[in-house]
Amino acid sequence: MTETLQSCSLTTLLDHPGFLEGEFWYRKNYDADQLVFLEGETGSEIYVILNGKVSVCAQVRVSDDRHMQSGLCELFDGEEFAHSCFFDNEPHSATVKTVSPCQLAVIDAEKLKQFLYDQPDIGFLLLFHWMKIILPRLRQSNKRFSSLFSWGLKAHQIDSLIQ
């Protein structure tokens, strides 16, 4: 237990004797190029990649009748995604699709909340771990937004009007 308390991720939590497979989580196998979930769908599960690779993509509206997929990142063994359903019931902000055959641990967010309520020391460490994952992703998103905004200003020659 001391090992878990020094560092806690969902991967280490899967090995916790009280966080039983079949009760709190289950394994799901995916073939390559298979959809895990779509942007806009509401989900109640958090995922850990046990093996394989997934791609995270978002819809970009080019015009009213044209859309394209933009690749945001790829995630690999041990990485986690879809954390937001733990905090709210908002739809997924991206589509996740497998790149290679994958085995995912699928964790019920409500059951995880109950487990962490009963184990607040683990809950604190897991939330801290999530902040270490989510903050770099947010920073990267901010950089991309700034770059695209700057590009848009230059493309429309608005940058020359700004003093």
Identify the meaning behind each predicted range:
Residues 1-163:
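Cytosolic regulatory regions built on CNB/CRP/Popeye-like sensor folds
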